[in-house]
Amino acid sequence: MAVPKRKTSPSRRGMRRSADALKAPTYVEDKDSGELRRPHHIDLKTGMYRGRQVLKVKSAEA
């Protein structure tokens, strides 16, 4: 059975747990449409990604 040789200090334990916290998602304002979107994601309103059209946008009537 695996047993630690030394006691884990509170500082080391805290450093390990510092990555466990939930972080709020980041959003950036799209420079073309002004909508908020996630970084490195497609703008779903326009279908654009990095200045290129990658999705066909459905019309509002459909």
Curated annotation (Swiss-Prot):
The record's listing under Pfam families reads: Ribosomal_L32p (PF01783)
Q: Which GO terms describe its biological process?
A: translation
Say if the entry is tagged with keyword Kinase: no
Q: InterPro entries, alphabetically? A: Ribosomal_bL32, Ribosomal_bL32_bact, Ribosomal_zn-bd
For molecular function, the Gene Ontology terms on record are: structural constituent of ribosome
Q: What is this protein called?
A: Large ribosomal subunit protein bL32
Q: In which family does this protein belong, per the annotation?
A: Belongs to the bacterial ribosomal protein bL32 family.
Stretches for region Disordered: 1-44
Q: Which NCBIfam families match?
A: rpmF_bact
